[in-house]
């Protein structure tokens, strides 16, 4: 049975300006969902409320039917909610292998278990050839692979990806899409927010389109593209997947 990450009736205001109004979003394990919209639509604020970076004024976040609205990010992580920020999160002066090990050392594992898990993650993310490469020398796509390996070290049930396609070349985009498919195949639920609409819709089963702080529509990528209102306020008439 699928587990759920749910945002229910979220509201958020800044200086009396409502930026998110009655937004509900749901992600199941084993599916990839997009959270998209034009600038100022409220998608980033909604995303940050689900991550735990921003507290909603009203509404609730549920993880596996437990209300986590008031929990800090590290408690959400322990419950299975992973987060990859847009900004580089690898340690620049540490090797790729040591970046993964740094996360494993926070878990109650024996040295042998840590080493075995480290090698497993390096293998699964095709990082063996980069194991001794320092974080500052990694390309954008390589860095993303290390960051995903670090996130997987916590055995998450859900991973929230903030702008995963930003600042990487077209070949790396394909690699990141493949990695996201691998996450889905593992049964992990993935929520993506990104300004690269075509790349995001190309990997999602469903997407939510926010506009003026509200959910304008939700559906499959093709349903999103075919929606006249979405084309009017966001995609334009010439957009194709």
Curated annotation (Swiss-Prot):
Binding of ATP, residues: 37-44
Keyword Phosphoprotein in record: no
Subcellular locations according to the entry: Cytoplasm; Cell inner membrane
InterPro entries listed in its UniProt record: AAA+_ATPase (IPR003593), ABC_AA/LPS_Transport (IPR051120), ABC_transporter-like_ATP-bd (IPR003439), ABC_transporter-like_CS (IPR017871), LPS_export_LptB (IPR030921), P-loop_NTPase (IPR027417)
Chief location: cytoplasm
Enzyme Commission code(s) on record: 7.5.2.-
Any one Gene Ontology cellular component term annotated for this protein: ATP-binding cassette (ABC) transporter complex
One biological process term in Gene Ontology: transmembrane transport
GO function term, MF aspect, one: ATP binding
Membrane disposition: Peripheral membrane protein
Keyword set includes DNA-binding: no
Pfam families per UniProt: ABC_tran
Sorted UniProt keywords: ATP-binding, Cell inner membrane, Cell membrane, Cytoplasm, Membrane, Nucleotide-binding, Translocase, Transport
Stretches assigned to the ABC transporter domain: 5-237
Assembly, per entry: Component of the lipopolysaccharide transport and assembly complex. The LptBFG transporter is composed of two ATP-binding proteins (LptB) and two transmembrane proteins (LptF and LptG).
Family per record: Belongs to the ABC transporter superfamily. Outer membrane lipopolysaccharide export (TC 1.B.42) family.
Protein's name in the database: Lipopolysaccharide export system ATP-binding protein LptB
Source species of the chain: Acidithiobacillus ferridurans
